[in-house]
């Protein structure tokens, strides 16, 4: 599978031997969120690129899907892990909370929203959208993805095997901006 831009530039070549080997092309903003990306080490770097920008507000807005009491998010050094990890503050609480203590779903939302916000004018690939996300919050995340992809001119490609995910996509797609494509393997042919 290859995605090309303007019929010439290969943005994402996928290779049979390593389906996770992706080469990013210079000049085209691109992010790939894999199925297992919940607490990716890249999140701190992605956060830094949009910190103090107009888009930063969308991070907490997206996290509100799962916990509306979140006020702020920042990445702080963790001496044990030797990396920066996400912490949040909650309304009415002074203590900071590690985002990792709040479940896989909220960490998946963070990874998705940070990747999306770093693709302005580019492309986001999101493998298995629903992984770690309860079906009840999927429609709200889809609405944020639709809104931001239109606002920031981002083309989003998502895979899923989940009927709940497909149903929430259809419900959130009220402006008909998204397109659902079903691929099947029939007798060795993709149709």
Model-predicted regions and their roles:
Residues 95, 122-123:
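The start of beta-strands in P-loop NTPase/AAA+ ATPase cores
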Residues 103-115, 159, 164:
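Phosphate-binding glycine-rich loops of NTP-binding sites
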């Amino acid at each position: 599978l290859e995605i090309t831009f303007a019929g010439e530039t290969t943005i994402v070549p996928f290779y049979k031997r390593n389906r996770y080997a992706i080469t990013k092309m210079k000049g085209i903003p691109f992010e790939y969120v894999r199925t297992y990306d919940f607490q990716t080490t890249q999140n701190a770097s992605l956060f830094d690129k949009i910190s103090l920008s107009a888009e930063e507000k969308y991070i907490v807005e997206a996290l509100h899907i799962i916990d509306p009491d979140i006020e702020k998010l920042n990445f702080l050094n963790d001496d044990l892990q030797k990396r920066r990890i996400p912490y949040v503050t909650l309304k009415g609480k002074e203590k900071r909370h590690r985002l990792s203590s709040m479940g896989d779903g909220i960490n998946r939302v963070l990874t998705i929203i940070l990747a999306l916000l770093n693709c302005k004018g580019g492309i986001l690939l999101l493998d298995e959208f629903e992984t770690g996300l309860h079906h009840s919050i999927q429609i709200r995340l889809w609405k944020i993805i639709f809104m931001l992809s239109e606002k920031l001119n981002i083309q989003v490609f998502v895979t899923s095997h989940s009927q709940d995910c497909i149903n929430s996509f259809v419900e959130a797609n009220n402006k008909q901006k998204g397109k659902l494509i079903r691929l099947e393997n029939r007798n060795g042919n993709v149709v």
